[in-house]
Amino acid sequence: MAPSQLPPMFNPTPQDIEMLLAAQCHLGSKNLQVHMEPYLWKTRPDGVNVINIGKTWEKILLAARIIAAIDNPADICVISARPYGQRAVLKFAAHTGATAIAGRFTPGNFTNYITRSFKEPRLIIVTDPRTDAQAIKEASYVNIPVIALCDTDSPTEFVDVAIPTNNKGRHAIGLIWWLLAREVLRLRGTLATRETEWDVVVDLYFYRDPEAEENKEIADETKVPGAEEIGAGAVESGFAGENWDTQAPGAGVPGTAFAAATAAPTSWEADGGDWAASSAAPAGESWAETQPAEAKW
Protein backbone atom coordinates (compact mmCIF):
# COMPACT_ATOMS: atom_id res chain seq x y z
CA MET A 1 0.00 0.00 0.00
CA ALA A 2 1.34 3.42 -0.93
CA PRO A 3 1.97 6.07 1.73
CA SER A 4 -1.28 7.68 2.86
CA GLN A 5 -1.91 11.37 2.05
CA LEU A 6 -4.70 11.63 4.63
CA PRO A 7 -4.58 13.25 8.08
CA PRO A 8 -3.66 10.73 10.78
CA MET A 9 -7.21 10.60 12.15
CA PHE A 10 -8.53 9.38 8.78
CA ASN A 11 -5.99 6.60 8.36
CA PRO A 12 -7.52 3.12 8.07
CA THR A 13 -7.22 0.72 10.97
CA PRO A 14 -5.54 -2.68 10.54
CA GLN A 15 -8.98 -4.26 10.78
CA ASP A 16 -10.20 -2.17 7.83
CA ILE A 17 -7.24 -3.26 5.72
CA GLU A 18 -7.77 -6.91 6.67
CA MET A 19 -11.44 -6.68 5.69
CA LEU A 20 -10.58 -5.15 2.31
CA LEU A 21 -8.09 -7.92 1.62
CA ALA A 22 -10.40 -10.69 2.88
CA ALA A 23 -13.22 -9.46 0.62
CA GLN A 24 -10.77 -9.39 -2.34
CA CYS A 25 -11.41 -5.73 -3.04
CA HIS A 26 -7.85 -5.46 -4.34
CA LEU A 27 -8.27 -8.02 -7.14
CA GLY A 28 -9.15 -6.43 -10.45
CA SER A 29 -9.65 -7.97 -13.86
CA LYS A 30 -7.08 -8.87 -16.49
CA ASN A 31 -7.98 -5.86 -18.63
CA LEU A 32 -6.82 -2.36 -17.75
CA GLN A 33 -8.54 0.85 -18.72
CA VAL A 34 -6.14 3.73 -19.25
CA HIS A 35 -7.87 6.02 -16.74
CA MET A 36 -7.68 3.35 -14.02
CA GLU A 37 -3.91 2.99 -14.34
CA PRO A 38 -3.12 5.46 -11.49
CA TYR A 39 -4.95 3.15 -9.07
CA LEU A 40 -2.98 0.07 -10.11
CA TRP A 41 -0.52 -1.46 -7.65
CA LYS A 42 0.96 -4.18 -9.85
CA THR A 43 0.10 -6.95 -12.29
CA ARG A 44 0.43 -10.55 -11.19
CA PRO A 45 2.16 -13.17 -13.38
CA ASP A 46 -1.25 -14.63 -14.28
CA GLY A 47 -2.33 -11.25 -15.70
CA VAL A 48 -4.65 -10.15 -12.87
CA ASN A 49 -4.29 -6.46 -12.02
CA VAL A 50 -3.95 -5.70 -8.30
CA ILE A 51 -5.56 -2.49 -7.06
CA ASN A 52 -3.87 -0.24 -4.50
CA ILE A 53 -6.23 -0.43 -1.52
CA GLY A 54 -4.68 2.75 -0.13
CA LYS A 55 -6.21 4.60 -3.10
CA THR A 56 -9.46 2.75 -2.49
CA TRP A 57 -9.61 4.00 1.08
CA GLU A 58 -8.83 7.58 0.06
CA LYS A 59 -11.63 7.56 -2.50
CA ILE A 60 -14.08 6.09 0.03
CA LEU A 61 -13.38 9.02 2.35
CA LEU A 62 -13.68 11.52 -0.51
CA ALA A 63 -17.03 10.05 -1.57
CA ALA A 64 -18.25 10.08 2.04
CA ARG A 65 -17.39 13.78 2.38
CA ILE A 66 -19.32 14.55 -0.80
CA ILE A 67 -22.35 12.59 0.44
CA ALA A 68 -22.26 14.21 3.89
CA ALA A 69 -22.18 17.69 2.30
CA ILE A 70 -25.69 17.22 0.86
CA ASP A 71 -28.29 18.53 3.30
CA ASN A 72 -31.20 16.32 2.29
CA PRO A 73 -30.18 12.63 2.18
CA ALA A 74 -33.16 11.83 -0.04
CA ASP A 75 -31.51 13.83 -2.84
CA ILE A 76 -28.87 11.09 -3.10
CA CYS A 77 -29.76 8.22 -5.42
CA VAL A 78 -27.95 4.88 -5.09
CA ILE A 79 -28.29 2.54 -8.06
CA SER A 80 -27.40 -1.08 -8.73
CA ALA A 81 -28.56 -3.14 -11.69
CA ARG A 82 -26.10 -5.87 -10.74
CA PRO A 83 -27.77 -8.45 -8.44
CA TYR A 84 -24.78 -8.59 -6.09
CA GLY A 85 -25.22 -4.91 -5.26
CA GLN A 86 -28.99 -4.66 -4.88
CA ARG A 87 -29.08 -5.74 -1.25
CA ALA A 88 -26.18 -3.40 -0.47
CA VAL A 89 -27.83 -0.29 -1.95
CA LEU A 90 -31.08 -1.03 -0.14
CA LYS A 91 -29.23 -1.30 3.17
CA PHE A 92 -27.20 1.83 2.40
CA ALA A 93 -30.40 3.74 1.67
CA ALA A 94 -32.01 2.48 4.89
CA HIS A 95 -29.05 3.56 7.03
CA THR A 96 -28.28 6.91 5.38
CA GLY A 97 -31.71 8.02 4.12
CA ALA A 98 -30.81 7.91 0.43
CA THR A 99 -33.11 6.83 -2.40
CA ALA A 100 -32.40 3.36 -3.78
CA ILE A 101 -32.99 2.00 -7.28
CA ALA A 102 -32.32 -1.74 -7.10
CA GLY A 103 -32.77 -3.69 -10.30
CA ARG A 104 -33.51 -2.40 -13.77
CA PHE A 105 -33.11 1.33 -14.25
CA THR A 106 -36.11 2.68 -16.16
CA PRO A 107 -34.93 4.94 -18.99
CA GLY A 108 -36.14 8.48 -18.48
CA ASN A 109 -35.95 8.49 -14.68
CA PHE A 110 -33.77 11.60 -14.75
CA THR A 111 -34.81 13.17 -18.06
CA ASN A 112 -38.50 12.45 -18.72
CA TYR A 113 -40.56 14.45 -16.22
CA ILE A 114 -43.83 12.93 -17.50
CA THR A 115 -43.04 9.51 -16.05
CA ARG A 116 -44.28 8.65 -12.58
CA SER A 117 -40.80 7.57 -11.46
CA PHE A 118 -39.16 10.87 -12.43
CA LYS A 119 -36.41 11.95 -10.00
CA GLU A 120 -34.15 14.97 -9.66
CA PRO A 121 -31.28 13.84 -7.43
CA ARG A 122 -28.30 16.00 -6.60
CA LEU A 123 -25.91 13.02 -6.60
CA ILE A 124 -25.99 9.43 -7.83
CA ILE A 125 -23.83 6.49 -6.74
CA VAL A 126 -23.66 3.44 -9.01
CA THR A 127 -22.26 -0.03 -8.38
CA ASP A 128 -20.87 -0.69 -11.85
CA PRO A 129 -20.41 1.90 -14.64
CA ARG A 130 -20.91 -0.82 -17.23
CA THR A 131 -24.22 -2.26 -16.03
CA ASP A 132 -25.49 1.14 -14.85
CA ALA A 133 -24.50 2.94 -18.05
CA GLN A 134 -28.04 4.23 -18.69
CA ALA A 135 -28.16 6.01 -15.34
CA ILE A 136 -24.74 7.59 -15.90
CA LYS A 137 -25.71 8.69 -19.39
CA GLU A 138 -28.89 10.40 -18.21
CA ALA A 139 -27.03 12.00 -15.30
CA SER A 140 -24.64 13.58 -17.80
CA TYR A 141 -27.61 15.15 -19.62
CA VAL A 142 -28.86 16.96 -16.51
CA ASN A 143 -25.48 17.67 -14.83
CA ILE A 144 -25.75 15.24 -11.90
CA PRO A 145 -22.42 14.28 -10.27
CA VAL A 146 -21.63 10.56 -10.40
CA ILE A 147 -19.74 8.39 -7.90
CA ALA A 148 -19.00 4.88 -9.16
CA LEU A 149 -17.36 1.68 -7.96
CA CYS A 150 -14.86 1.07 -10.77
CA ASP A 151 -12.85 -2.04 -11.58
CA THR A 152 -9.66 -1.93 -13.63
CA ASP A 153 -11.66 -2.45 -16.85
CA SER A 154 -14.58 -0.12 -16.06
CA PRO A 155 -15.31 2.84 -18.35
CA THR A 156 -14.87 6.14 -16.52
CA GLU A 157 -16.68 8.41 -18.97
CA PHE A 158 -18.98 10.86 -17.13
CA VAL A 159 -17.78 9.46 -13.77
CA ASP A 160 -16.69 12.23 -11.40
CA VAL A 161 -15.37 10.14 -8.49
CA ALA A 162 -14.16 6.60 -9.14
CA ILE A 163 -13.70 4.27 -6.17
CA PRO A 164 -11.19 1.65 -7.39
CA THR A 165 -12.31 -1.77 -6.23
CA ASN A 166 -13.46 -5.17 -7.35
CA ASN A 167 -17.07 -4.55 -8.39
CA LYS A 168 -17.86 -8.13 -9.44
CA GLY A 169 -17.57 -10.05 -6.16
CA ARG A 170 -20.48 -10.12 -3.74
CA HIS A 171 -18.27 -9.64 -0.70
CA ALA A 172 -16.25 -6.82 -2.25
CA ILE A 173 -19.37 -4.88 -3.29
CA GLY A 174 -21.04 -5.33 0.09
CA LEU A 175 -17.95 -4.28 2.02
CA ILE A 176 -17.40 -1.08 0.01
CA TRP A 177 -21.01 0.01 0.51
CA TRP A 178 -20.74 -0.82 4.24
CA LEU A 179 -17.54 1.20 4.66
CA LEU A 180 -19.07 4.09 2.71
CA ALA A 181 -22.18 4.10 4.91
CA ARG A 182 -20.08 3.96 8.08
CA GLU A 183 -17.90 6.90 7.03
CA VAL A 184 -20.98 8.95 6.09
CA LEU A 185 -22.51 8.35 9.52
CA ARG A 186 -19.23 9.31 11.17
CA LEU A 187 -19.03 12.58 9.25
CA ARG A 188 -22.66 13.39 10.03
CA GLY A 189 -22.05 12.80 13.73
CA THR A 190 -24.40 9.84 14.06
CA LEU A 191 -21.44 7.87 15.38
CA ALA A 192 -19.95 9.91 18.22
CA THR A 193 -16.26 9.32 17.50
CA ARG A 194 -14.17 7.39 15.04
CA GLU A 195 -13.37 4.92 17.80
CA THR A 196 -17.07 4.09 18.19
CA GLU A 197 -17.89 0.75 16.62
CA TRP A 198 -20.87 0.57 14.29
CA ASP A 199 -23.36 -2.00 15.56
CA VAL A 200 -24.37 -3.01 12.00
CA VAL A 201 -22.42 -6.04 10.80
CA VAL A 202 -21.07 -6.11 7.28
CA ASP A 203 -22.88 -9.40 6.55
CA LEU A 204 -26.15 -7.49 6.11
CA TYR A 205 -24.73 -5.88 2.97
CA PHE A 206 -23.75 -9.17 1.33
CA TYR A 207 -25.85 -10.66 -1.46
CA ARG A 208 -27.89 -13.75 -0.59
CA ASP A 209 -29.47 -16.08 -3.11
CA PRO A 210 -33.26 -16.12 -2.47
CA GLU A 211 -33.69 -19.63 -3.88
CA ALA A 212 -30.93 -21.03 -1.67
CA GLU A 213 -32.44 -19.37 1.40
CA GLU A 214 -35.92 -20.69 0.51
CA ASN A 215 -34.62 -24.24 0.03
CA LYS A 216 -32.84 -24.02 3.36
CA GLU A 217 -36.04 -22.91 5.11
CA ILE A 218 -38.02 -25.75 3.50
CA ALA A 219 -35.41 -28.26 4.62
CA ASP A 220 -35.57 -26.93 8.17
CA GLU A 221 -39.39 -27.11 8.20
CA THR A 222 -39.54 -30.69 6.90
CA LYS A 223 -36.98 -31.83 9.45
CA VAL A 224 -38.70 -33.66 12.33
CA PRO A 225 -37.72 -32.03 15.62
CA GLY A 226 -35.98 -34.38 18.02
CA ALA A 227 -35.59 -37.19 15.48
CA GLU A 228 -31.84 -37.25 15.84
CA GLU A 229 -32.03 -37.34 19.64
CA ILE A 230 -34.56 -40.20 19.60
CA GLY A 231 -32.48 -42.23 17.17
CA ALA A 232 -29.31 -41.62 19.10
CA GLY A 233 -30.99 -42.65 22.37
CA ALA A 234 -32.31 -45.88 20.88
CA VAL A 235 -28.90 -46.82 19.56
CA GLU A 236 -27.23 -46.02 22.86
CA SER A 237 -29.79 -48.08 24.82
CA GLY A 238 -29.30 -51.01 22.46
CA PHE A 239 -25.56 -50.91 22.90
CA ALA A 240 -25.91 -50.66 26.66
CA GLY A 241 -28.01 -53.84 26.90
CA GLU A 242 -25.42 -56.05 25.29
CA ASN A 243 -22.32 -57.58 26.82
CA TRP A 244 -19.53 -57.15 24.32
CA ASP A 245 -17.11 -59.19 26.45
CA THR A 246 -19.18 -62.36 26.16
CA GLN A 247 -18.19 -64.38 23.12
CA ALA A 248 -19.45 -67.60 21.66
CA PRO A 249 -17.34 -70.71 22.24
CA GLY A 250 -14.52 -70.79 19.77
CA ALA A 251 -15.23 -67.28 18.53
CA GLY A 252 -11.71 -66.16 19.28
CA VAL A 253 -10.07 -69.07 17.44
CA PRO A 254 -9.28 -68.26 13.80
CA GLY A 255 -10.91 -70.55 11.27
CA THR A 256 -13.34 -72.13 13.76
CA ALA A 257 -16.45 -71.13 11.87
CA PHE A 258 -15.07 -72.41 8.57
CA ALA A 259 -14.05 -75.69 10.15
CA ALA A 260 -17.50 -76.19 11.67
CA ALA A 261 -19.16 -75.53 8.36
CA THR A 262 -17.01 -78.02 6.52
CA ALA A 263 -16.96 -80.70 9.25
CA ALA A 264 -19.93 -82.69 7.92
CA PRO A 265 -19.33 -84.04 4.42
CA THR A 266 -21.84 -82.98 1.90
CA SER A 267 -23.74 -85.84 0.24
CA TRP A 268 -25.94 -85.23 -2.76
CA GLU A 269 -27.69 -88.59 -2.16
CA ALA A 270 -28.53 -87.89 1.50
CA ASP A 271 -31.95 -86.51 0.72
CA GLY A 272 -32.94 -89.69 -1.02
CA GLY A 273 -34.26 -87.83 -3.97
CA ASP A 274 -34.32 -89.39 -7.41
CA TRP A 275 -33.26 -86.93 -10.12
CA ALA A 276 -34.62 -89.19 -12.84
CA ALA A 277 -38.03 -89.44 -11.19
CA SER A 278 -38.52 -85.71 -11.21
CA SER A 279 -38.22 -85.61 -14.95
CA ALA A 280 -40.44 -88.64 -15.59
CA ALA A 281 -43.86 -88.14 -17.09
CA PRO A 282 -46.90 -88.33 -14.75
CA ALA A 283 -48.51 -91.71 -14.20
CA GLY A 284 -51.04 -92.68 -16.77
CA GLU A 285 -49.58 -90.53 -19.45
CA SER A 286 -47.35 -91.45 -22.36
CA TRP A 287 -45.54 -89.48 -24.98
CA ALA A 288 -47.62 -91.13 -27.63
CA GLU A 289 -50.85 -89.93 -26.06
CA THR A 290 -49.68 -86.39 -25.75
CA GLN A 291 -48.40 -86.15 -29.30
CA PRO A 292 -51.00 -85.27 -31.98
CA ALA A 293 -51.93 -87.87 -34.48
CA GLU A 294 -50.00 -87.69 -37.68
CA ALA A 295 -51.93 -86.82 -40.75
CA LYS A 296 -52.47 -89.67 -43.16
CA TRP A 297 -51.74 -88.83 -46.76
UniProtKB/Swiss-Prot annotation:
GO molecular function: structural constituent of ribosome
Gene Ontology biological process terms, A to Z: ribosomal small subunit assembly; translation
Biased composition (Low complexity): 263-289
Entry GO CC: cytosolic small ribosomal subunit
Classification via InterPro entries: Ribosomal_uS2, Ribosomal_uS2_C, Ribosomal_uS2_CS, Ribosomal_uS2_euk, Ribosomal_uS2_euk/arc, Ribosomal_uS2_flav_dom_sf
Compartment(s) of residence: Cytoplasm
Keywords of this entry: Cytoplasm, Ribonucleoprotein, Ribosomal protein
Positions of the UniProt region annotated as Disordered: 263-297
Family statement: Belongs to the universal ribosomal protein uS2 family.
Function, as annotated: Required for the assembly and/or stability of the 40S ribosomal subunit. Required for the processing of the 20S rRNA-precursor to mature 18S rRNA in a late step of the maturation of 40S ribosomal subunits.
Complexes and interactors: Component of the small ribosomal subunit. Mature ribosomes consist of a small (40S) and a large (60S) subunit. The 40S subunit contains about 33 different proteins and 1 molecule of RNA (18S). The 60S subunit contains about 49 different proteins and 3 molecules of RNA (25S, 5.8S and 5S). Interacts with rps21.
This protein's name: Small ribosomal subunit protein uS2
Organism per entry: Neosartorya fischeri (strain ATCC 1020 / DSM 3700 / CBS 544.65 / FGSC A1164 / JCM 1740 / NRRL 181 / WB 181)
